From Swiss-Prot:
Assembly information from the UniProt record: Part of the 30S ribosomal subunit. Forms a bridge to the 50S subunit in the 70S ribosome, contacting the 23S rRNA.
One family name in Pfam for this protein: Ribosomal_S15
HAMAP family found in the cross-reference section: Ribosomal_uS15_B
Entry similarity comment: Belongs to the universal ribosomal protein uS15 family.
Molecular function GO labels: rRNA binding; structural constituent of ribosome
NCBIfam families linked to this entry: S15_bact
Species for this entry: Gluconobacter oxydans (strain 621H)
PROSITE patterns: RIBOSOMAL_S15 (PS00362)
Gene name of the record: rpsO
Gene Ontology CC: cytosolic small ribosomal subunit
Signal peptide region: none
Lineage: superkingdom: Bacteria
Listed name of the protein: Small ribosomal subunit protein uS15
Taxonomic lineage from the root: Bacteria, Pseudomonadati, Pseudomonadota, Alphaproteobacteria, Acetobacterales
Record key words, sorted: Ribonucleoprotein, Ribosomal protein, RNA-binding, rRNA-binding
Function description: One of the primary rRNA binding proteins, it binds directly to 16S rRNA where it helps nucleate assembly of the platform of the 30S subunit by binding and bridging several RNA helices of the 16S rRNA.
Length: 89
């Protein structure tokens, strides 16, 4: 369900804005998206795992908030991120 340290490092290096960037909205959204995909796969096999489903909904809400923030602050970065991640919006 969780992502490995190597995968997290790869996501950070792919979406970072500067050399020391680990907490920009782009990086946070990329990590959350990876966790959401993993948890969705888990829930496909464990349909009655409602505790994990609640965690999934919280992660989706957090990602939505970060995307809304990024859209408000910098429309170009927002568009670039959703295209790179393949999100619907």
């Amino acid at each position: 369900m969780s992502i490995t340290a190597e995968r997290r490092t790869a996501l950070i290096s792919e979406y970072k804005q500067s050399e020391t960037d680990t907490g920009s909205p782009e990086v946070q959204v990329a990590i959350l998206s990876e966790r959401i995909v993993n948890l969705t796969e888990h829930l496909k096999t464990h349909k009655k795992d409602f505790h994990s489903r609640r965690g999934l909904l919280m992660m989706v809400g957090q990602r939505r908030s970060l995307l809304d923030y990024l859209k408000r602050k910098d429309q170009a970065r927002y568009q670039s991120l959703i295209e790179r991640l393949g999100l619907r919006r």
